[in-house]
């Protein structure tokens, strides 16, 4: 009841049909449909066990590079200031006490921390893949090398960027005039740290999902998440600093529930950014009709058929382009159905090709292997204007519907009466 009331209320807004508002609704609907809040809760639980190992591995890699060793404390403080809210609870001191004790571990201990970090990244990948409707994760040596690259190069890139920014900050150029405006050194450093936050989100959105994510989508989603994250951090920090009654209730344990709440909110932002990156690749169609699944699959096969004639493959973006807004969520399931019938194959470039001669596949054989009913007369009329192939199959479907309606129009009582 509440859902329909809210929907009717939104439809009364003068900008309801605007593309930008429909895009926002699309993202929010998918956020709820994908149960992102539940996934954020699961990731919060995982993060609780993995945050210290990840920070420790990060600091070990930084310390192993002499050029970055002087910036370790500053870089550590940068991480805390960017990813933890300001409040009366010293989150950084609590985490420092754990990481300092963990930094004296043996090789076996460090290996354990590395495995824990890899498991954390694997959990993140699973959550991202669910949003992208990808059922398979990268396994084996490819998955391991990708995780190793993120773990090893991530700290080095951030550390190098911080060293460069510190060098620039030590110069006098940060307080000079630029285009007639007086530049603030603190503001420049904030921009640098904000840029590093964007870089972190970009690496997540671009590299973690097991599919090709367009760079522009990852960049825009990273900027969106970084802005929301910065806003939430300030609001959260202000609330925690001015409403301290929770400390009277929890006492010395006040940091635990607050830290869990912050992690939960942070993961919601991260997953919302994933939804934005997906929406940027999917929400580009002005077609609003949701067609019968069998008709949708025929439209997809037509795309593959035309591409095969040209000796080309089909990308996700090309397939999504022929779908309506209510159909794009079914694309992964359509791919799975076509693969089961050995009609298409996935290439090493995450694209798809038609691998069978469609002249040897009849419609009835294709249809009976699908988990969908036969399209009826009403379904034949609900198509897109460019579905020209419907001119051939449409009359046959209408004739089949009329035939079945005539043959099966039997009173139910007749079925149950004795002879």
Curated annotation (Swiss-Prot):
Parts of the chain that traverse the membrane: 42-62, 105-125, 148-168, 186-206, 212-232, 252-272
Localization per record: Cell inner membrane
Entry coiled-coil feature ranges: none
Alphabetical list of Pfam families matching this protein: Virul_fac_BrkB
Claim: tRNA-binding is one of the keywords in the record: no
Signal peptide annotation: none
Alphabetic keyword roster: Cell inner membrane, Cell membrane, Membrane, Transmembrane, Transmembrane helix
Main location: membrane
Membrane topology per record: Multi-pass membrane protein
InterPro entries with a match to the protein in the record: UPF0761_bac (IPR023679), Virul_fac_BrkB (IPR017039)
GO cellular component: plasma membrane
Highest rank taxon of the organism: Bacteria
Similarity comment text for this entry: Belongs to the UPF0761 family.
Protein name: UPF0761 membrane protein ACIAD3168
